[in-house]
Amino acid sequence: MIIILYLSVALIAVAFLVLVIYLSKTLKSLQLTLKNVASTLEGLEGQMKGITTETAELLHKTNRLAEDIQEKSEKLNTVVHAVQGVGASVQQFNTSMKQAAGSVSASVRENQDKINQVVTWSQAAMEIWEKWKQKKKSAL
């Protein structure tokens, strides 16, 4: 019976030894995996610093670009207002020209008889003058 006890203790010792060996291998494998994870995280940390720097630079450039666009937009607004002023001036000029043309047209209509008389008298004067020139020529 003691032999069974010794055999049982020996079997327990062997089982414990096997357990310790496999546990040791597992822990070494875990240690290697954790070292790989640590080196990967260090590389990732370096990449994140680079990305953070680039992101900050990009954000600054974007802000400068937005400010530049804002300034140019304000300048363009002044140009648009100036063009609107020119458009209003041209419209007023057109209105004045239409009124002047209307006044001239009304004046011509009112004085049509007088204009016809002036044209008739002018033609008569021209005919008299032409005849006088011809008489003068024939007299020479």
Swiss-Prot record:
Pfam families per the UniProt record, alphabetical: DUF948
Keyword Nucleotide-binding attributed: no
Membrane topology: Single-pass membrane protein
Coiled coil: 25-77
Transmembrane segments: 1-21
Keywords: Coiled coil, Membrane, Transmembrane, Transmembrane helix
Cytoplasm listed as a keyword: no
Compartments in which it is found: Membrane
A Gene Ontology term for the protein's cellular component: membrane
Similarity comment: family membership: Belongs to the UPF0478 family.
Name of the protein this chain belongs to: UPF0478 protein YtxG
Source organism (scientific name): Bacillus subtilis (strain 168)
Gene that specifies this protein: ytxG
